[in-house]
């Protein structure tokens, strides 16, 4: 073994990448370049990978090689869940965790002065995701180096102090002398609740000489068996059958909540809250704002009473600065604080994720400023916030930006270190591009649409305005072409339904203004038509054109038509770059005797698992986002049939959640809600 290979082996020995896939095309070179960059201490690198080129597999190999705790950041829950599922399959023997917002529904507290309307915070917490968040922090604090956390931008939002979280853990070992009641007291400090009847997550049951702990961050039950005041055994049990899974000599029990504090810190916090309350009330009174002063005094006084009696109150996160002991204006603790200093950060779809990271702080402060100004909250509420972008950057160590169209920021941060990955394992090429005049563009488009319909393929049409999208949809429907449109006025559930009906063949054409959204990488789409492509602007710049054209990149007949009367700089750059990639892809296919093959859309995480059991090594094909249930038949169902379907969907949803297939579960839930709404209407 060469020295370099030995070095990589020793560094990555904590990670075990399990896959029958083998790096192909650009992947081996990309893996090597990114790995060497990390090893050499390069601060930032960019992986420019086209749709379907296997970027996730490349990143998995880099993680294995460098052997560091890794945070993978995605810009939405759905894509984060997909990445989590893929990483879980690649690293089944390592700690792969999922950290996103645990709200199924969240209405933030707000006040609208123009109408004197106060909106109370309203939320619904997803218990399963709460468990997974705790599992992520527990894994990071355990000292393990083989931890991968896939997260949304929730990772920059405030949470408990990791030092406090770590201080509260209870270490147990066989032979340890500890009174059973002392153990129960310490578990209570960790916010575990005693329940000797039925045991749920975060609860403790006592029966004779055994203490059963339903860990807040695990699906397993921990059983502590005593012999007098000595721990005789520590076992992990199946919670349903109570069958032993594993025995331990020692075990660390972590808190049942990310926000945990002790009595002393609570009393100190209350004193500081009272001091700040007096100052703010005096401030309002001097300004003649008696209503605001009275409102603030009543609200905060009530909160203090609740904290004293129960240890918490509604909106306690607005007092987090006091409990953390932070100075005014300082950043909150967040998930990044749980990582060691040498962690690796991977930002997926960085052209979208980075701007999102920029925007979080401003939006949060705008709402909080109004609440403070009108006496609903103390100024300290503004310190319960997401990180500023500058704070986020300061906390990062080494980063890999991943995108098919990296923005100027990523390229500048990478100082020109852009690793290219344009060869697809399937041999598929970038779509060919044609430029046609705008005169009679609709008639020309109609001919192209008819050809696609004959081949049972789908079409995406991009217009400049919502009105144009609606008018074109109406026209196409009038000619007998099954057409739908998507724009900002179409809500999320309706958008998902339309996309699925496009895939199912209910629609042949989808018209939209901005079809850059993730989840539109549909193998059935062979044609992308961009109307008025020469109108320079946000949706017609080089990056947007490249992203839009890429929607046809998963089809063997992929083609893009730009309707324009002139060639703009953005069009020229897009055409030149696409042609360059196509030449490289064609050359690779010819050299390796590869015939482009149509992508089979992977429908579920279960399909991925089934695929991974094949024995013949092959190239990794990046899965397209999950397919939603086809709903065309729903209109023909009776009410009773719909109720039966809802019951079936609920059962499947619960099964999917147990298998950690959260994308599947969410889709099944949405379909269930849609059918329920139809019954009620």
Stretch-by-stretch model annotation:
Residues 5-601, 608:
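ASCE RecA-like P-loop NTPase motor cores
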Residues 7-14, 587-667, 672-681:
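Acidic, low-complexity intrinsically disordered tails
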């Amino acid at each position: 073994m060469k020295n370099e290979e030995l070095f990589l082996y020793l560094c990555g020995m904590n990670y075990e990448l399990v896959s029958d896939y083998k790096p192909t095309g650009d992947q081996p070179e990309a893996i090597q370049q990114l790995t060497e960059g990390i090893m050499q201490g390069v601060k930032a690198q960019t992986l420019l990978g086209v749709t379907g080129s296997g970027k996730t597999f490349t990143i998995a190999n880099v993680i294995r090689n460098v052997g560091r705790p890794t945070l993978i950041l995605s810009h939405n829950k759905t894509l984060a869940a997909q990445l989590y599922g893929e990483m879980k399959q690649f690293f089944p023997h390592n700690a792969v965790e999922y950290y996103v917002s645990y709200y199924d529904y969240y209405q933030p507290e707000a006040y609208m002065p123009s109408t004197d309307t106060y909106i109370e915070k309203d939320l619904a917490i997803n218990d399963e995701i709460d468990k997974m968040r705790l599992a992520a922090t527990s894994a990071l604090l355990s000292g393990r180096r083989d931890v991968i956390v896939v997260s949304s931008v929730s990772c920059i939002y405030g949470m408990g102090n990791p030092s406090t979280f770590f201080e509260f853990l209870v270490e147990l070992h066989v032979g340890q002398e500890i009174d059973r009641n002392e153990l129960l007291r310490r578990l209570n400090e960790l916010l575990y609740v005693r329940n000797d009847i039925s045991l749920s997550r975060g609860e403790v049951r006592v029966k004779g000489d055994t203490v059963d702990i339903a860990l807040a961050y695990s699906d397993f039950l921990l059983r502590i068996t005593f012999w007098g005041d000595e721990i005789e055994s520590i076992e992990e049990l199946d919670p349903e059958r109570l069958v032993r899974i594993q025995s331990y000599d020692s075990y660390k029990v972590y808190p049942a909540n990310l926000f945990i504090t002790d009595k002393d810190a609570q009393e100190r916090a209350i004193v500081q809250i009272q001091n700040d309350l007096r100052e703010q009330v005096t401030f309002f009174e001097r300004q003649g704002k008696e209503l605001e002063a009275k409102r603030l005094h009543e609200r905060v006084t009530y909160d203090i009473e609740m904290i004293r009696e129960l240890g918490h109150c509604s909106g306690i996160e607005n007092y987090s600065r006091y409990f953390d002991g932070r100075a005014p204006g300082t950043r909150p603790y967040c998930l990044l604080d749980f990582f060691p200093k040498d962690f690796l950060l991977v930002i997926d779809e960085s052209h979208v994720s980075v701007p999102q990271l920029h925007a979080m702080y401003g939006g949060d402060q705008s709402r909080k400023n109004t609440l403070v100004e009108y006496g609903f909250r103390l100024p300290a509420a503004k310190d319960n916030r997401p990180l500023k972008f500058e704070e986020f950057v300061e906390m990062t160590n080494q980063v890999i930006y991943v995108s098919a169209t990296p923005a100027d920021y990523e390229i500048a941060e990478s100082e020109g270190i852009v690793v290219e990955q344009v060869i697809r394992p399937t041999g598929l090429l970038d779509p060919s591009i044609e430029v046609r005049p705008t005169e009679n563009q609709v008639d020309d488009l109609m001919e192209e649409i008819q050809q696609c319909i004959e081949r049972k393929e789908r079409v995406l049409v991009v217009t400049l305005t919502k009105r144009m999208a609606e008018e074109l949809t109406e026209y196409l429907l009038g000619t007998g072409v099954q057409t739908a449109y998507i724009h900002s006025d179409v809500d999320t559930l309706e958008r998902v339904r339309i996309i699925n009906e496009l895939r199912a063949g209910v629609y042949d054409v989808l018209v939209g203004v901005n079809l850059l959204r993730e989840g539109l990488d549909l193998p059935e789409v062979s044609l992308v038509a961009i109307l008025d492509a020469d109108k320079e602007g946000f949706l017609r710049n080089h990056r947007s054109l490249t992203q839009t054209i890429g929607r046809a990149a998963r089809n063997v007949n992929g083609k893009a038509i730009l309707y324009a009367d002139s060639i703009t700089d953005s069009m020229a750059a897009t055409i030149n770059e696409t042609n360059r990639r196509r030449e490289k892809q064609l050359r690779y296919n010819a050299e390796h005797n590869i015939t482009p093959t149509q992508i089979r859309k992977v429908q579920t995480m279960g399909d991925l698992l089934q695929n991974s059991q094949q024995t013949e090594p092959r190239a990794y094909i990046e899965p397209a986002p999950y397919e939603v249930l086809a709903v065309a038949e729903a209109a023909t169902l009776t009410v009773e049939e719909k109720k039966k379907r809802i019951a079936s969907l609920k059962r499947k949803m619960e099964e999917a959640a147990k298998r950690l297939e959260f994308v599947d579960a969410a889709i099944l839930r949405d379909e269930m809600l849609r059918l329920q709404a139809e019954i009620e209407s």
